[in-house]
Each structure stands twice: as structure tokens, then as C-alpha cells.
């Protein structure tokens, strides 16, 4: 289509401009994929590919059928990972999967007209936690105790349509849960008081680093650390 070809032409003619768009999205999203929250990994070597691309939340093709030009709308642009589909990213043994059912984010979404049925990452309220996770599998589930009722259907659709329970993502989330468990167990073994240690852990895990980036799978850590996480986020005026 004309819309898709214009995007390709923009990238070819203006590589610096496209790079600047990516860098701004990277800053706006604190270094995380807008859908799965894996860290955005830029290429380390010449033969690597950035695990990062620009996604149009409302598909570019929608511009052809509606008055709004989604193609050029900054608020329609998201920075996302390759969803496990790109073998030439850094850390491919961790980030790439040859199996179709292990692909996530905008890979299964494609140009399907589902934008009205899933959560728009730019409009998710920062003040509430929408998801919880199974501690022994890393599986993502809508948290009915904290996710607003009006968002629960969209939240479920988001997990399903973007395949956010791909085995690859569950494995990564489980790795973070294990790290948090180990940190807590080590602290307790060293004589720490849980109520004093957990706020410190929440602060170290949930606040942005010196580059303004969040830890990957931020929402997993937020869920795992419970009220200690919410207290730290409130104190620091969290609004992702």
C-alpha cells in the first residue's frame, strides 16, 4: 500500500531521522518494549540487529479507511522488540525462538484490526497494577483484585492477542522471580528484617537507572513486591 511504502521510503531516505525516532521512543519508554517489557537491546556488533522496531498501535493501513492519519501520529508510535522473531539480535539464545507459537508482541498482532480490543500502552493508568504472575511458571494473568473492571476484558485480550504468555517470555519472567526470591532469602539469612529490606529492594529494582531506564519486566517486580512496591512508586510520583 502507499502508506506502507511511504514508511519504507522515509527509513531509506532519512536513516538519521528514523534513528532519532527510535531514540526518543527508547527514552519515553524507559528502555522497555511497550508490550512485553523486555529490555530494548541495541545491536552490539555490526552483524547484529537492534531488538527494537517502531510499531504503529493503530495499523498504518487504518489511515486509508479513516480521516485520522495514524501513520504520522506520534502518539500512535511505540517502540517494541522483535517478539522473538529475529535471529540476529544480541543474546539470540535468550531472545530468539524458531517456533511460531513463541512469538509475541506485534508479531502475532500484525495488521489485524484489534487495536480497539487491547490495551494501548500509552493509556494504561500508572497508579494501578493490572497483572499478576504465577510464581512457579512466570505466567501472566489479569489481577482482578487491582485491575479496574472496565479494563479487565481488554487486559485479557492483550495477553491473548499479543501472546504475552509465550514460553520464551514466561521463562524470562520466571528468571526475575527467582532473582527476587534469592535476594530476599539471602537478606533474611544475613539477619535482615523483612519490613526494612523490602523497601530497599523495591527502590533498587523499580526506580530508573542513571540512563532513565527501568529494569526489564518492571510489572513482574511491581507485583512481586506488593505494597512495598506501591509505596516506593507513590513516593517517587511514578507515571510511566
Where do the language-model regions lie?
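Short, flexible, mixed-charge glycine/proline-rich loop motifs
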Residues: 19-29, 70-73
Amino acid at each position: 500500500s502507499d502508506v506502507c511504502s511511504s514508511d519504507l521510503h522515509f527509513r531509506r531516505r532519512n536513516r538519521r531521522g528514523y534513528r532519532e525516532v527510535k531514540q526518543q521512543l527508547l527514552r519515553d519508554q524507559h528502555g522497555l518494549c511497550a508490550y512485553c517489557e523486555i529490555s530494548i537491546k541495541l545491536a552490539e556488533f555490526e552483524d547484529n540487529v537492534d531488538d527494537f522496531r517502531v510499531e504503529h498501535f493503530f495499523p498504518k493501513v487504518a489511515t486509508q479507511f479513516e480521516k485520522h492519519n495514524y501513520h504520522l501520529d506520534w502518539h500512535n508510535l511505540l517502540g517494541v522488540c522483535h517478539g522473538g522473531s529475529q535471529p540476529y539480535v544480541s543474546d539470540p539464545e535468550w531472545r530468539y525462538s524458531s517456533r511460531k507459537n513463541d512469538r509475541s508482541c506485534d508479531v502475532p498482532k500484525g495488521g489485524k484490526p484489534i487495536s480497539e480490543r487491547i490495551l494501548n500502552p500509552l493509556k494504561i493508568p500508572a497508579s494501578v497494577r493490572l497483572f499478576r504472575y504465577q510464581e512457579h511458571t512466570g505466567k501472566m494473568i489479569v489481577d482482578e483484585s487491582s485491575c479496574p473492571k472496565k479494563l479487565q476484558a481488554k487486559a485479557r485480550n492483550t495477553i491473548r492477542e499479543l501472546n504475552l504468555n509465550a514460553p520464551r517470555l514466561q521463562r524470562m519472567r520466571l528468571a526475575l522471580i527467582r532473582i527476587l526470591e534469592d535476594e530476599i532469602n539471602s537478606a533474611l539469612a544475613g539477619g535482615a528484617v523483612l519490613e526494612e529490606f523490602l523497601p530497599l529492594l523495591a527502590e533498587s529494582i523499580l526506580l530508573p537507572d542513571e540512563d532513565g531506564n527501568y529494569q526489564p519486566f518492571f510489572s513482574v517486580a511491581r507485583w512481586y513486591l506488593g505494597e512495598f512496591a506501591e509505596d516506593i512508586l507513590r513516593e517517587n510520583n511514578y507515571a510511566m
